[in-house]
């Protein structure tokens, strides 16, 4: 009944008020718009193929696409993405935690390639104290940088600055002080209107 009443996201371009473009649909019902609704990319996902399977398998799986508002092209990222994909603030990347691999991944929405963000870092990004039957969650994402130039990821103690393109080496911005002294560093955003973190704030 709820599905029958469901509405789907679309857009109307400025200057073309009578042209409505449907973005989401029955096959890809969930849409996340980048840039506070004004970005180039839209993340589309669907859990529908895995609803029955989810009754015994609690791991997240979603078929995932990116819609390019400029070219009006739909690009498939994966069927399924093993996780809960999200779109970065400026919309340049789709990212997710792969609980099976215990790694963070990102899909470059512009160049259309997937990058393992944490494979070369010699610490665990998964919750080492996980005591549930399911696969462990990540410690989380602290913030993205301006224009999605970097992402800050947590391990158990420290914060890592990672280039989602993969050109710059990962940097432990807390200098391993957290792990050395068993102190947990976390980023607290005191400005609710702030969508990203600037390099000067690090």
Report the location of each language-model feature:
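Beta-propeller folds
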Residues: 1-202
